[in-house]
Amino acid sequence: MKEPPVQLDLPDNPWLELRRLTPARIALGRTGTSIPTNAQLDFQFAHAQARDAVHLPFDPAGLSSQLAERGRDSLLLHSAAADRHSYLQRPDLGRRLSDESAQALRDHASANPGGVDLAVVVADGLSALAVHKHTLPFLTRMEEQTHAEGWSLSPVILVEQGRVAVADEIGQLLGAKMVVILIGERPGLSSPDSLGLYFTYNPKVGLTDAYRNCISNVRLEGLSYGMAAHRLLYLMREACRRQLSGVNLKDEAQVQTLESDDPDLMKGNFLLSSPDD
């Protein structure tokens, strides 16, 4: 008589439940001493997406048109990096404007004297995909709050082949009290479209990262647009009060928690947010 198959009493894997809560690669399983084929293919696909995000061309003209439809002026500038190859090989060139762009910005500042509270800069960085996807919805949320508090803003400065520090030169040339740059972050294997915000008080050429505050991972699966705008406005208020930014200015904005009963305070957690937040 044939013996019945042995029923193995396998232990529960608590990681499987956690997989649905994060895009991180956990509980992949294994096949022999390797990971399953599907997990390997998924990894290779994510790596290809990250590489594509770095080389995706920025479309400043298209973004400028979308801003114009919403009633926002913009200026199209270029860093000193002539192309993507130069940008990747020479980070220093991405931190400064080209001579032509710097002069164009001086001309704009001369025609519009008086400066502004906040210069708004958008640069492709290492992920134009992030900029294309998240700039407009974030600016909408940010400008709702800056308008309510009476802050004056510059036109949106669109910089091709730009790095974080290019915002300091732009803020200085515009005579801005503060500057924020929206820039595509280095793509990760689970986040090829992550937008970063870098904020500086009293911007000028030559400042280091120690003088900047960073708000990172702005995207639907990360920090919501509303919460990112909330944190930025907090930094703006505190920077003006204390006249500084960077390592000496801590982000102590109200942090949203899972235990909060206020639905408006739940928008910073991607587990509880709707796609429209």
Curated annotation (Swiss-Prot):
Cofactor(s) it depends on: adenosylcob(III)alamin
First-tier enzyme category under EC: lyase
Enzyme Commission number: 4.3.1.7
GO CC term, one of those recorded: ethanolamine degradation polyhedral organelle
Single GO MF annotation: ethanolamine ammonia-lyase activity
Manner of cofactor binding, per the entry note: Binds between the large and small subunits.
Catalytic function, reaction form: ethanolamine = acetaldehyde + NH4(+)
Function: Catalyzes the deamination of various vicinal amino-alcohols to oxo compounds. Allows this organism to utilize ethanolamine as the sole source of nitrogen and carbon in the presence of external vitamin B12.
Full protein name: Ethanolamine ammonia-lyase small subunit
Source species: Pseudomonas fluorescens (strain SBW25)
Gene responsible for this protein: eutC
